[in-house]
């Protein structure tokens, strides 16, 4: 029972990161457009994106649990750092676009590259101490690479590249 509770609390802690980081966003004028039809054939409908992040943050929580089970608790900070970077997407895309009047797509692409690089670094740091935790980090890379393809497609449609 204690193991299940630890697992659930690990997962819940990553959901808390997602919520707490994004709670101020609407109060500082950052809003994602919803209900917009994707313009690219491979872009998922808008409602899919929060579901994917729900799954990815669940995997990060399971990764934390793996670290706790192997006595490598200090390494969980790498996972939390990655979670904060991922959750801060609205701030480094929409927020910077609002401040600079430069397309959010540029900031999205730059941010995605940073997320990919940091997620790979985190997986590399975790691999020697917990291979499952390292592997559970890699879906963030896969999703963010896919999201970057969407951003690049949108940039092409907007004639930014």
What does each model-found stretch correspond to?
Residues 25-27, 51, 140:
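Hydrophobic residues in alpha-helical membrane-spanning segments
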Residues 1-11:
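N-terminal membrane topogenic signal
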Residues 11-30:
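Alpha-helical transmembrane segments of multi-pass membrane proteins
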Residues 20, 32-129, 156-161:
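Portal/gating segments that form or line small-molecule/metal binding sites
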Residues 124-161:
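Terminal transmembrane helical module of multi-pass membrane proteins
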Residues 4-5, 42-44, 133:
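Alpha-helical interaction segments
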